């Protein structure tokens, strides 16, 4: 009697598991728990601990995240100093690269075993005017990885299959991780500047995680690149990335004059990836007449100030550029896979994330930190 009951229970459990994995279309053994970093309040302790493995919805894929880039946005999400509130508790991270291990029943564009990337934009409505025009990141219903949706600072994370990045097999997952946000973001910013080969572009914050990639994308687009930054090793990294002229803001006595002299009248475009409010406003002074200033970095509570008379007489433009859409992602990834862009990364363990945030706050990071989720 009891033996029969146990057999029936075991059969029912097996059927339940089979249905579950069939529903998820998974052929991988997926654990119930995983390691991740989570915080329960803004500015609170970053806890490296066991977390439940999420289950993908019908439109989602489950990615076994191998590596994730560490972005300034992750720092803002933890601090909670942006006007957009984060979900709490939260697992941060939005530059995750890994392998698809499960998918919902409605997913058609990914197969189990494919390489996939988690981006800042996790999902959008795909039916509003903005989404129809390719501005998915501006959708009022946008779901953001590592901000409103648990992100890639964990070993398993979900992503909307429509927005997830498709990564070619054989790609170095550690090196492509920063491309999924930093790379796409600066690539889109350079497209927004709409410059022509041979023209000058200034990258403000040229040796950081975004800036070091912006220098390379700009060079690959045929632009002449002036970099602005300050700190040990930053000029060397800038030159390694292909930059032409470096201005150290710590040493320059007249930034505007030095930049305009180096570029024969000022750069045709400026990409502001720095989080310095003063540097952003200064870019409106040194950009050449008819030039364009592109805002990318997001310092909390900051304003860009442009003196109206000069703004009008010089006929300059100020534009905001906010990440990129699916086409931008595909194009930015293609630059990387063809070897035109390389990620200057330092790999650390996921458990070391708090130390990475501390160095980021101090402005001591060259290139990009990438976390190994299994360390």
From Swiss-Prot:
Binds 2 Zn(2+) ions per subunit. It holds the Pfam family ADH_N. Residues 1-27 form a transit peptide. Its main location: mitochondrion. Disulfide bonds: none annotated. This is Alcohol dehydrogenase 4, mitochondrial. Zn(2+) 1 binds at residues 71, 94, 181. CDD domains: CAD3. Homotetramer. InterPro entries: ADH-like_C, ADH-like_N, ADH_Zn_CS, GroES-like_sf, NAD(P)-bd_dom_sf, PKS_ER. It comes from Kluyveromyces lactis (strain ATCC 8585 / CBS 2359 / DSM 70799 / NBRC 1267 / NRRL Y-1140 / WM37). GO terms for molecular function: alcohol dehydrogenase (NAD+) activity; zinc ion binding. Zn(2+) 2 binds at residues 125, 128, 131, 139. SUPFAM superfamilies: GroES-like (SSF50129), NAD(P)-binding Rossmann-fold domains (SSF51735). The keyword Nucleus does not apply. It catalyses: a primary alcohol + NAD(+) = an aldehyde + NADH + H(+); a secondary alcohol + NAD(+) = a ketone + NADH + H(+). Its cofactor is Zn(2+). NAD(+) binds at residues 205-211, 229, 234, 296-298, 368. It is an enzyme of class 1 (oxidoreductase). It is found in: Mitochondrion matrix. SMART domains: PKS_ER. Gene3D superfamilies: Medium-chain alcohol dehydrogenases, catalytic domain (3.90.180.10), NAD(P)-binding Rossmann-like Domain (3.40.50.720). The keyword Oxidoreductase applies. One of its GO terms (cellular component) is mitochondrial matrix. Its EC number is 1.1.1.1.
